[in-house]
């Protein structure tokens, strides 16, 4: 997407490592723990999260079911749906429990300028980059109402913290100093 390309161009500028679409890992490895997070914005993703079938260990089930968490890039919904059905085959029925949109918004305007100013006031060396979130966000619902929203989480995390590796985990956390920094930035923004 345009947002992801702008992000990667900025990372190239910061690291001196060119982005090669044929070998994205070369640049992604420069990002450390966030490489998995950013890598998910380069492609549609699917992760099987549940499998269930049968009622007893020694009985072959007549049917089974599974759940797959699918995230797609903007305007890729139909392609992904068709590809999943192709991969699953004709004997598998796919049911959608929940579907959201892929969302991309322009990284410009008074709100973005205010976020950059608030962050720069607390950390003059901060580099603000556009980013497209592949996960769920209220901004997807707000966009249906004509409201453009932005995620803004100014935490100033220590480089050694694998923050993205803790998402939705039993030990998800951030340092208190990161929250204090973020609070100061948000007060400036508001």
Predicted features and spans:
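Metal-dependent amide/peptide-bond hydrolase catalytic core
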Residues: 1-181, 187
């Amino acid at each position: 997407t345009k947002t992801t390309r702008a992000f990667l161009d900025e990372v190239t500028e910061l690291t001196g490592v060119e982005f090669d679409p044929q070998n994205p890992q070369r640049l992604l490895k420069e990002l450390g723990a966030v490489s998995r997070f950013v890598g998910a914005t380069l492609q549609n993703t699917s992760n099987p999260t549940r499998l269930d079938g049968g009622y007893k260990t020694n009985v072959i089930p007549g049917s089974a079911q599974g759940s797959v968490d699918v995230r797609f890039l903007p305007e890729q919904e139909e392609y992904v749906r068709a590809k999943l059905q192709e991969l699953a085959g004709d004997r598998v029925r796919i049911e959608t429990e929940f579907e959201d949109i892929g969302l991309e918004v322009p990284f410009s305007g008074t709100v973005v300028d205010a976020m950059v100013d608030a962050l720069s006031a607390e950390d003059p060396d901060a580099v603000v980059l556009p980013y497209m979130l592949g996960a769920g966000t209220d901004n997807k619902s707000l966009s249906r109402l004509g409201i453009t929203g932005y995620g803004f989480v100014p935490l100033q995390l220590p480089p050694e913290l694998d923050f993205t590796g803790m998402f939705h985990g039993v030990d998800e956390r951030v340092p208190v100093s990161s929250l204090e920094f973020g609070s100061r930035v948000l007060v400036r923004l508001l």
